[in-house]
């Protein structure tokens, strides 16, 4: 019997850790080229796997490191097959699924401030509601058509009908309206968060 002091946040943490313990979720640090299209290619190569966490922050280097959580079938064979597929596609990655520090802390530390931008560029940040179904992220990136430079991305599966993502774009100041027109065409609800105090304090 669960005591009344166990709140929903604690329950969510227990479920998340138990999925890793049962080998249903894997956590990877995976490197991709820092260029337009790489983000979408990774999502396409992941396929119809259920993404539980997806965290990325542009830092000005030639390679981007993605913190990726995936829910797989409850078998070692499923995991081995997936990782072999990544190797065959020439991805460089580290399996952090059994690393306690990563499970406890890294997922909440990954990111930080972005690179210094030239004066004509700004970073615009939006919270976006993604349908909780396989392929939703790939659909979002496909509809954007590699037109926009994504500089920040964090998605967390909350087990609800919609999952929240925080997405940042590096654009010229005059492109804000054009970007928002493209976001409207995708039909995922979004809210501009560029002036958010938390973003300003820790991520800008």
Language-model segments: which ranges?
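A conserved regulatory-domain signal marking ACT and ACT-like small-molecule sensing domains
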Residues: 6-204
């Amino acid at each position: 019997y669960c005591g009344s002091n166990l709140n929903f946040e604690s329950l969510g943490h227990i479920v998340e850790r138990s999925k890793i313990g049962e080998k249903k979720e894997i956590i990877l640090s995976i490197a991709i080229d820092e260029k337009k299209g790489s983000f979408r290619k990774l999502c396409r190569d992941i396929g119809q796997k259920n993404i539980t966490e997806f965290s990325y922050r542009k830092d000005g280097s030639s390679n981007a490191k993605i913190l990726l959580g995936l829910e797989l079938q409850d078998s070692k064979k499923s995991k081995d097959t997936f990782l072999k597929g990544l190797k065959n596609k020439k991805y460089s990655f580290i399996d952090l699924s059994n690393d306690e520090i990563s499970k406890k802390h890294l997922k909440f530390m990954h990111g930080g401030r972005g690179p210094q931008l030239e004066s004509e560029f700004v970073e615009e940040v939006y919270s976006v509601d993604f349908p909780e179904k396989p392929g939703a992220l790939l659909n979002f990136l496909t509809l954007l058509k590699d037109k926009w430079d994504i500089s920040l991305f964090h998605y967390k599966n909350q087990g609800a009908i919609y999952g929240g993502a925080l997405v940042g774009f590096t654009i010229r100041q005059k492109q804000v309206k054009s970007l928002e027109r493209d976001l409207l065409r995708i039909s995922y609800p979004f809210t501009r968060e560029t002036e958010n105090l938390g973003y300003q304090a820790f991520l800008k």
